[in-house]
């Protein structure tokens, strides 16, 4: 899958470093190409729906009020 257009300006490619799953929400740590870690709290259902797992390449999308993750 590729993203063809999106209105989020701040995008960071990276790799899922760690997932801490909870019953409702989960914490996903993404290590970027520069070595920085971006952490996102998303629903556990989204973790499963996106097929997120440690080592998976993702894009962290940072908007002023939220951080979203899109799979590649």
Where are these regions (language model features)?
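Non-catalytic connector elements of ABC transporters
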Residues: 1-72
